[in-house]
């Protein structure tokens, strides 16, 4: 192979770990590999990562020296929170004078519900900051150690202005052999309770994430790649693995961010809705003016000082099963063939479809018994799915990832047609209409929330089931649509192309030029520490006058780029087509009115 420089993206999923190699100059996808995710290996998922890297490099003759960027997306932080697999946290609250009692109350955050029945357990000690001696701090830390805490959080009112006391607690805790962090390291916003809560969630993730980060980093080094490993963030950017060790909370929900990054960087979507459809669910997000839309994250219904992409997930996808009640289709999903442990009818050999008969089952013990499967002479039963309906109706191209055995699907749906007295096509359209009405409602919400123009946006589909969802949805809603190139790997591609990103917020009423200069300086320090080349960094400043928030958003690449690979030249014919589509007309009705340059 030639010596072109490449970027590697790795996406660690529940079942498979995907790896892609992308040409650094052209964005061409050079290679793709899929290996089983190694949850139970001695090195955990890191073992699957090294297998994916070695396979993709060896098979394609790529030298590790030619890899100039490597990053991976992880669901570990999200999974740890959902499963309650987190460390017990000790909080050292501080305050003085009239603020002392309020500070004591606001740093006592209690046990934080992470998911139904799963909690982050916190212990609390309070010190009057007016007498913050080393002895007082050590006494508080020792008391917390007796309560079996693994991590210390130091939290004080106004530490965003002066973090000295928090830094003292952190330093003494580290000397005691504990991992420690402070509220000022997580957020620059006032609001002691929310800052403490966010710091506690972050701290609870640190021990587990440090262990995984070390194994993953060593795995990458073992492959011979010299560039530092970057990790996907929840806002669509990446950060260095050293920063992950300090702020693992920023990787929470990052699994949803990778696909959006792919739509933004690879598909160059500037205004539209991105839908990443898998087997069980579809993740839906908005992109406006070439920017991802973000929101404040929550845990247990309480706000965190953490921004993540506004990604809305719906239990409709290629594997969604068909619900039958009263002799007709009543619903689609949320259960999928995967959850029911059934094969898709459309991915089944025709010779298995002998003597088909519809049966109604409960995919899980607590589900209703109205999900349709087709039982066959071989003793097996197969799920009727949305993918089957889309294939039968001709919405899935023959070379698509979701393309299947249409003949088998027609046999299965034919059994349902016999039971309901409808035709196969009528049933398939009923199922698609029910499903796409649900998806369409979320698309409409995003269009309204972000003031997008339906005539100018495009629906872009990614994921293995993109062609099952997006073409029918676009047709139904009258909105332009397309399937992303390499759609099944769009998340992994997004990881490989993502920029380093940092965001900083401060409470400032009527910010002065000096306030803006200071936040620009500070975020530049943070983003370069996170791995960005200073020469590539772009900083935007936002002022929220209603909330008195001064916000800086910085993005940058890990290497100096010789050209803007995101720059896209649109021909006059393409411009005419875009305008014609927006105005629901043809290109021969569009004329150039003026030109410049």
Language-model segments: residues:
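N-terminally biased helix-coil "hinge/interface" segments that flank
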Residues: 2-597
């Amino acid at each position: 192979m030639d010596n072109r420089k490449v970027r590697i993206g790795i996406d660690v999923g529940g079942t498979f770990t995907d790896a892609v190699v992308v040409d650094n100059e052209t964005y061409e996808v050079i290679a793709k590999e899929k290996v089983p995710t190694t949850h139970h290996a001695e090195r955990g998922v890191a073992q699957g990562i090294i297998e994916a890297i070695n396979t993709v490099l060896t098979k394609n003759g790529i030298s590790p020296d030619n890899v100039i960027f490597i990053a991976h997306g992880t669901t570990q932080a999200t999974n740890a929170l959902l499963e309650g697999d987190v460390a017990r946290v000790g909080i050292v609250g501080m305050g003085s004078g009239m603020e002392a009692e309020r500070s004591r109350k606001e740093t006592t955050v209690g046990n934080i519900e992470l998911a139904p029945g799963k909690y982050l357990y916190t212990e609390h000690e309070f010190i009057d900051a007016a007498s913050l001696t080393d002895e007082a701090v050590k006494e508080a830390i020792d008391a917390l150690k007796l309560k079996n805490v693994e991590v210390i959080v130091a939290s004080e009112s106004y530490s965003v202005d002066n973090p000295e006391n928090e830094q003292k607690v952190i330093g003494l805790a580290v000397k005691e052999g504990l991992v420690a962090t402070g509220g000022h390291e997580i957020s620059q916003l006032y609001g002691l309770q929310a800052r403490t809560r966010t710091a506690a969630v972050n701290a609870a993730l640190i021990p587990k994430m440090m262990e995984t980060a070390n194994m993953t980093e060593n795995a990458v080094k073992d492959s011979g790649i010299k560039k530092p490993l970057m990790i996907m963030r929840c806002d669509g950017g990446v950060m260095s693995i050293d920063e992950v060790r300090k702020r693992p909370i920023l990787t929470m929900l990052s699994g949803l961010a990778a696909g959006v990054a792919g739509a933004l960087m690879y598909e160059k979507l500037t205004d539209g809705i991105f839908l990443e459809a898998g087997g069980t669910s579809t993740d839906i997000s908005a992109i406006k003016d070439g920017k991802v839309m973000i929101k404040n994250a929550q845990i247990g219904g309480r706000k965190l000082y953490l921004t993540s992409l506004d990604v809305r997930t719906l239990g409709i996808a290629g594997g969604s099963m068909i619900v039958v009640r009263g002799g007709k289709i009543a619903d689609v999903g949320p259960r999928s063939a995967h959850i029911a442990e059934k094969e898709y009818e459309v991915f089944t050999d025709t010779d298995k479809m002998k003597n088909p008969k519809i049966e109604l089952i409960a995919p899980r013990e607590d589900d209703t018994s109205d999900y349709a499967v087709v039982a066959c002479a071989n003793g097996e039963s197969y799920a009727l799915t949305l993918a089957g309906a889309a294939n039968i109706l001709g919405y899935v191209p023959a070379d698509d990832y979701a393309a299947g055995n249409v003949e088998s699907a027609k046999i299965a749906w034919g059994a349902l047609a016999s039971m309901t007295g409808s035709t196969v096509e009528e049933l398939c359209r009923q199922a698609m209409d029910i499903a796409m009405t649900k998806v369409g409602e979320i698309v409409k919400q995003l269009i309204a929330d972000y003031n997008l123009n339906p005539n100018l946006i495009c629906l872009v589909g990614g994921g293995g089931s993109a062609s099952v969802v997006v073409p029918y949805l676009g047709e139904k809603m009258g909105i332009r649509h397309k399937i992303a190139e390499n759609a099944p790997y769009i998340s992994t591609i997004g990881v490989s192309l993502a920029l380093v990103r940092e965001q900083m917020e401060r409470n400032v009423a009527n910010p002065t030029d000096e306030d803006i200069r200071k936040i620009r300086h500070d975020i530049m320090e943070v983003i370069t520490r996170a791995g960005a080349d200073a020469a590539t960094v772009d900083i935007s400043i936002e002022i929220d006058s209603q909330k008195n928030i001064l916000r800086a958003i910085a993005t940058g690449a890990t290497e100096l780029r010789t050209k803007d690979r995101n720059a896209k030249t649109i021909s006059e014919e393409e411009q005419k087509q875009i305008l014609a589509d927006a105005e629901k007309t043809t290109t021969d009705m569009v004329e150039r009115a003026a030109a410049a340059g």
